[in-house]
């Protein structure tokens, strides 16, 4: 009976813990461009050229970019910098040691960030959209930005 009471008390706390884990920051609504192939291709180009230098997407293969209308030749010519094969995973050449030295922490893998950040406050896309829009210029930081 004692064990049952403890179990019920613990279960009663679950909703409160869930609400506390949500945070309280309001999310902006990301524009839905999931059917706009040119926007998706531009996003892939920006990600590979800027984000993939530090952040891996180790659960995604380059050949998945064909799903947004890119040909294998376009992928090879414009988006493959750390690999020779379109079937390879999107990994970075930055070592964990260098990342910790330069940034203070290893940049997170972004393979499933949109799924992981979905919450009752909004979709994972809303989270990423809000996150990227909150960067600002900060001359006091080594990178010049607040990230």
Predicted regions and their residues:
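Structured domain cores in non-transmembrane regions
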Residues: 65-108, 113
């Amino acid at each position: 009976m004692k064990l049952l009471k403890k179990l019920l008390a613990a279960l009663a706390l679950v909703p409160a813990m869930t609400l506390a884990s949500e945070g309280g920051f309001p999310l902006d609504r990301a524009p839905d461009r999931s059917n706009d192939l040119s926007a998706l291709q531009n996003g892939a180009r920006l990600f590979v050229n800027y984000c993939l230098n530090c952040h891996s997407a180790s659960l995604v293969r380059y050949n998945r970019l064909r799903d947004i209308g890119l040909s294998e030749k376009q992928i090879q010519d414009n988006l493959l910098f750390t690999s020779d094969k379109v079937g390879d995973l999107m990994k970075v050449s930055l070592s964990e040691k260098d990342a910790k030295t330069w940034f203070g922490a290893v940049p997170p893998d972004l393979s499933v960030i949109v799924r992981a950040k979905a919450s009752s406050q909004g979709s994972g896309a809303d989270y990423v959209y809000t996150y990227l829009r909150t960067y600002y210029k900060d001359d006091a930081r080594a990178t010049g930005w607040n990230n």
